[in-house]
Amino acid sequence: MSQTHRILLLNGPNLNMLGAREPKHYGSISLESIEEKIQTLATQHNVKVECFQANSEEKLINKIHESFQQVDFILINPAAYTHTSVALRDALLAVSIPFVEIHLSNVHKREPFRHHSYFSDVAEGVICGLGAKGYEFAFLFAMDYLAKK
């Protein structure tokens, strides 16, 4: 019997404002539309995806902790926490769930403070600057990764 893989899609602060927030950097697509696309892909691949967005570090950390031994892969856009949150990094390391770091914009073409990530060196991969398509690429990478386990 084949196992149905479980993926957690985590989105950090202000991503609930996608579509209205700085379309020059983030495009005009809503987070809801991104989540719907990932759910469609999940159905096509017989995978369960839970989507979660929070504007607070505590809620994101708690969700990661709840995922321990419950989730096979995490897709995370830490948003502004990318550059500030050792706590989120530590939570991901604590649960030992492989993850991909996603950014809609190319953080390396933006302000210098956005160039550093507390996640990149411990992520399976990093996707940035590809807009909403980056979520799809991250999902497909997760499928390949899990197929090889």
From Swiss-Prot:
The active site is at Y26, H103. One of its GO terms (molecular function) is 3-dehydroquinate dehydratase activity. The keyword Amino-acid biosynthesis applies. It catalyses: 3-dehydroquinate = 3-dehydroshikimate + H2O. Substrate binds at N77, H83, D90, L104, S105, R114. Pfam families: DHquinase_II. Keywords: Amino-acid biosynthesis, Aromatic amino acid biosynthesis, Lyase. Pathway: Metabolic intermediate biosynthesis; chorismate biosynthesis; chorismate from D-erythrose 4-phosphate and phosphoenolpyruvate: step 3/7. Belongs to the type-II 3-dehydroquinase family. NCBIfam families: aroQ, PRK05395.1-1, PRK05395.1-2, PRK05395.1-3, PRK05395.1-4. Homododecamer. This is 3-dehydroquinate dehydratase. It comes from Haemophilus influenzae (strain PittGG).
